[in-house]
A protein has these predicted regions:
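Active-site neighborhood of HAD-like aspartate-dependent phosphohydrolases
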Residues: 1-42
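An amphipathic alpha-helix signature
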Residues: 21, 34, 38, 58-66, ...
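A short acidic, helix-capping loop that chelates divalent metal ions and anchors anionic groups
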Residues: 23, 45-50, 121-123
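A metal-dependent, Asp-based hydrolase signature
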Residues: 46-82
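Substrate-recognition element of Asp-dependent hydrolases with the DxDx(T/V) motif
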Residues: 79-92, 97-127, 139-141
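Substrate-recognition "cap/lid" segment bordering the active-site pocket of phosphatases
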Residues: 112, 118-169, 179
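Nucleotide-sugar-dependent
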Residues: 172
Length: 180
């Protein structure tokens, strides 16, 4: 019997962004800085889809940091920006993730890390969070020049996995990820 395939969004679904909260507050002086940054990042990626602008998640993450620095009238140094972006590679998994992934894999499911982030970043995130043994495959949409929820990125995942798109399942915290 062929394994069923489940794609997992990584940022916020598998990995917990809350560890970034004190770092963002220290740099920007606001409890809301992290959520504002991530919202701007996701908004920008959606605008890129709608306007067919090619970018990378890394470029958008940098631009979103600049935007919130301006919003909070903060002098964002290159060192602070680098520290914030580097910390994104060291996020912990949510407390129930390892047990959930293990249960799925033990029951014959193929688990796939699937993200808008670069392959290098996702691979680092998976390794640094201790999840290397919990995913069969890691897929970045970066190669497509677009982002979730553009339907092309799901077709790309299906092609990469050599599976019909209708055989794929997606687990995501964000409902818009499932609209592609």
């Amino acid at each position: 019997m062929k394994k069923e395939v489940i794609l997992f969004d990584i940022n916020e679904t598998v990995l917990n962004l809350e560890s970034l909260q004190p770092k963002f507050k220290a740099v920007f002086g606001s409890e809301d800085a992290l959520s504002l940054w991530f919202s701007k990042l996701l908004h920008s990626s959606t605008v890129c889809i709608a306007t067919n602008v090619k970018s990378t998640f890394s470029e958008l993450a940098n631009a979103a940091l600049d935007a919130i620095a301006q919003r909070y009238n903060c002098d964002l140094t290159a060192e602070s920006k680098d520290a914030l972006l580097t910390s994104f590679a060291n996020l912990p998994p949510h407390t129930d993730i390892k047990a959930s992934l293990l249960k799925l894999r033990n029951n014959g499911f193929k688990t796939v890390a699937f993200s808008n982030s670069s392959l290098d970043l996702i691979t680092s995130q998976i390794k640094n969070s201790g999840l290397e043994d919990y995913f069969d495959t890691v897929i970045s949409v970066e190669e497509t020049g677009s982002f979730k929820p553009n339907s092309d990125v799901y077709k790309f995942a299906a092609e990469t996995l050599q599976e019909p798109v209708e055989n794929l399942r997606l687990v995501a915290t964000h409902d818009w990820d499932t609209h592609g």
